[in-house]
C-alpha cells in the first residue's frame, strides 16, 4: 500500500498486488478501475469501468534519446530507520545536473515486487517514447526523458523505494512524492482480481488517432 502526493491535489492511496504472472495496481478496492500488467506478455491493460473499456499498451521499441543524457547517483552515508529489518539509505539520482529523484530505499525489501515494477516500468517506457512526438519540446526535460523512457527503473536499483520525491519538470518542478504505507506477503490473492472484464478493447495507438 502506497500513498502519492502531488501539488494542489489530495493524496491518493494505491494498492499493488504482485504474483509471478501479474502486477495489479488499483485504489484498494476489488471493483472499478485498475491497471493489470501481464508479466509474460509485457503488456499493460488499463481497465476503465465507467467507460466499459480496456486500453491495451503493448511493449514498443525505444529509440535514441533526442538530447544527450548523463546520469549520476549521489548516495548519503547516513542511514534512515530500517524497514522490515532492511537498511534504508538515501540517494539523489541526477540527470544532466538536475535532481530527478530524492530517494529512500530499503535494499533487499520485497525483491519480487521490485522485479515486477522494473518489468512494468521498462515496458511502459516504449509508450512514453512514442508519446514524445506529441509532447511539447519544453516538457521534454532531462528528468522527464530519464525517468519515463531512458532510465525508467533506475530508482529500483537500490531496493524498494520507501519514500521518493520525483521531479520531471524544468528546474525540478512537478514534484510527486510516493511513500510506502504498509505491506504483507505470502497471502493468496483472489484469482478474479487478475481476470479482465468483457469490455471493449482498444490499443493506445487507436486511442491516440481519435
Model-identified regions with their sequence ranges:
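Extended soluble regions of mature proteins
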Residues: 1-210
Amino acid at each position: 500500500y502506497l500513498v502519492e502526493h502531488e501539488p494542489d491535489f489530495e493524496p491518493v492511496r494505491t494498492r499493488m498486488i504482485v504474483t509471478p504472472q501479474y502486477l495489479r495496481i488499483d485504489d484498494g478496492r476489488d471493483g472499478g478501475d485498475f491497471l493489470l500488467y501481464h508479466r509474460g506478455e509485457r503488456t499493460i491493460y488499463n481497465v476503465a469501468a465507467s467507460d466499459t473499456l480496456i486500453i491495451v499498451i503493448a511493449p514498443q521499441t525505444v529509440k535514441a534519446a533526442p538530447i544527450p543524457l548523463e546520469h549520476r547517483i549521489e548516495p548519503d552515508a547516513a542511514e534512515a530507520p530500517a524497514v522490515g529489518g532492511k537498511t534504508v539509505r538515501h540517494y539523489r539520482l541526477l540527470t544532466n545536473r538536475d535532481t530527478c529523484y530524492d530517494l529512500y530505499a530499503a535494499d533487499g525489501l520485497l525483491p519480487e515486487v521490485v522485479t515486477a515494477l522494473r518489468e512494468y516500468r521498462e515496458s511502459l517506457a516504449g509508450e512514453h517514447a512514442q508519446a514524445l512526438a506529441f509532447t511539447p519540446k519544453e516538457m521534454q526535460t532531462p528528468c522527464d526523458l530519464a525517468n519515463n523512457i531512458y532510465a525508467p527503473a533506475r530508482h529500483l536499483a537500490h531496493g524498494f523505494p520507501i519514500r521518493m520525491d520525483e521531479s520531471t519538470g524544468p528546474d525540478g518542478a512537478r514534484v510527486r512524492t510516493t511513500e510506502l504505507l504498509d505491506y504483507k506477503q505470502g497471502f493468496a490473492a483472489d484469482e478474479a482480481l487478475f481476470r479482465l472484464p468483457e469490455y471493449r478493447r482498444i490499443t493506445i495507438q487507436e486511442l491516440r488517432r481519435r
